[in-house]
């Protein structure tokens, strides 16, 4: 294919430059069509950005025209800095570059054609270009290829803040401080109210419990007192009756004085004893003697 360019009054040097540019464009287009026709490649974003100390995900996907073997043994590798740079990760070994120890995670499963490379705890030195590379076993043998442009990673400083006017910043800070103070005051007031209500409730419950205990003890003591008073009168008649029966028994057992008849005078002795009727209360001696005797005499005339 030839391209004819004619420039009126132009120089041969200018014509040669235009021819070179045209041939380069045609070559690039043919190369792209050839890759699409062959059907293999790695897709990655052109660039991505992250914050220092944070994390970043670099997504990737790949495609190919070959038929996979029974055991394709797929593996993913990554390079950095340039197309032929050092390997920083290899899933088949596995291998992680010393610079990325504990900071690389490959979210990819065997057999899948897409995944994500995650870089943790970003550093300023991580800012460079990254290239994904694919290995797999096909019916035609081992095939491998990688991304040509790669992905440019940009790392920004976490301390970077947008510039603002001092007056605006001061006013905003003062307003924010006032809002925070008001919120804290509101929270403290609400907390005091809740505490007061809780203490009042606890005090009321405590007083009710104490009053209930006092009433219970008073009722129990009163009940015991009534029971004691009821038992004492029941015991006193029984003890008095037993005492009187003892006294009466002694009176009945006492033999009257037998005075012999002397000069036609008959002496008789009467002693007090318990009554014949058990229902009648006995009469206690008036004096301190346990038993009183009365002597009567009768004179008989002949």
Swiss-Prot record:
Q: Where in the cell is it found?
A: Membrane
UniProt short sequence motif ITIM motif 1, positions renumbered to this chain: 265-270
Entries under Gene3D superfamilies matching the protein: Immunoglobulins
Q: Which processes are annotated in GO (biological process)?
A: signal transduction
Q: Which UniProt keywords apply?
A: Glycoprotein, Membrane, Phosphoprotein, Receptor, Signal, Transmembrane, Transmembrane helix
Coiled-coil intervals, chain numbering: none
Q: Where is the composition biased (Polar residues)?
A: 270-280
Q: Where is the signal peptide?
A: 1-31
Q: Which SUPFAM superfamilies match?
A: Immunoglobulin
* PTMs per UniProt: Phosphorylated on tyrosine residues.
Glycosylation-annotated residues: 90, 107
GO CC terms? cell periphery; membrane
Region (Disordered) residue spans: 228-293
The record places the following residue ranges in the Cytoplasmic compartment, namely 220-302
List the membrane topology term(s).
Single-pass type I membrane protein
Cysteines engaged in disulfide bonds, as pairs: none
Extracellular topological intervals: 32-198
Source organism, top-level taxon: Eukaryota
- What InterPro entries would the database entry show? Ig-like_dom_sf (IPR036179), Ig-like_fold (IPR013783), Immunoregulatory_rcpt-like (IPR051694)
Q: Where is this motif: ITIM motif 2?
A: 294-299
Copy the domain comment. Answer: Contains 2 copies of a cytoplasmic motif that is referred to as the immunoreceptor tyrosine-based inhibitor motif (ITIM). This motif is involved in modulation of cellular responses. The phosphorylated ITIM motif can bind the SH2 domain of several SH2-containing phosphatases. PTPN6 seems to bind predominantly to the first ITIM motif.
Q: Please report the name of this protein according to its UniProt entry.
A: Paired immunoglobulin-like type 2 receptor alpha
Its lineage opens with: Eukaryota, Metazoa, Chordata, Craniata, Vertebrata
Q: What is the primary gene name for this protein?
A: Pilra
């Amino acid at each position: 294919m030839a391209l004819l360019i004619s420039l009126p009054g132009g120089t041969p040097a200018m014509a040669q430059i235009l021819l070179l540019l045209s041939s380069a464009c045609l070559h690039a287009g043919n190369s792209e069509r050839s890759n699409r026709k062959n059907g293999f490649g790695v897709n990655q974003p052109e660039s991505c950005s992250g914050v220092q100390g944070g994390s970043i995900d670099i997504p990737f996907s790949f495609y190919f025209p070959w038929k996979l073997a029974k055991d394709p043994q797929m593996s993913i590798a990554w390079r950095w800095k340039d197309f032929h740079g050092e390997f920083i990760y290899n899933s088949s070994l596995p291998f992680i570059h010393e610079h990325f120890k504990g900071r690389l995670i490959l979210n990819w499963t065997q057999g899948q054609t897409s995944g994500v490379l995650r870089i943790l705890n970003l550093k300023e030195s991580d800012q460079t270009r990254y290239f994904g590379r694919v290995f797999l076993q096909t019916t035609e043998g081992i095939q491998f290829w990688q991304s040509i442009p790669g992905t440019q990673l940009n790392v920004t400083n976490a301390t970077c803040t947008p510039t603002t006017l001092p007056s605006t910043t001061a006013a905003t800070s003062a307003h924010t401080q006032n809002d925070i103070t008001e919120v804290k005051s509101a929270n403290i007031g609400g907390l005091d109210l809740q505490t007061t209500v809780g203490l009042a409730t606890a005090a009321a419950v405590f007083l009710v419990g104490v009053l209930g205990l006092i009433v219970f003890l008073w009722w129990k003591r009163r009940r015991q007192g009534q029971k004691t008073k009821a038992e004492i009168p029941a015991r006193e008649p029984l003890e008095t009756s037993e005492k009187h029966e003892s006294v009466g028994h002694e009176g009945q057992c006492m033999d009257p004085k037998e005075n012999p008849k002397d000069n036609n005078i008959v002496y008789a002795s009467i002693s007090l004893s318990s009554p014949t009727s058990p229902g009648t209360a006995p009469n206690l001696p008036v004096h301190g003697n346990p038993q009183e005797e009365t002597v009567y005499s009768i004179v008989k005339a002949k």
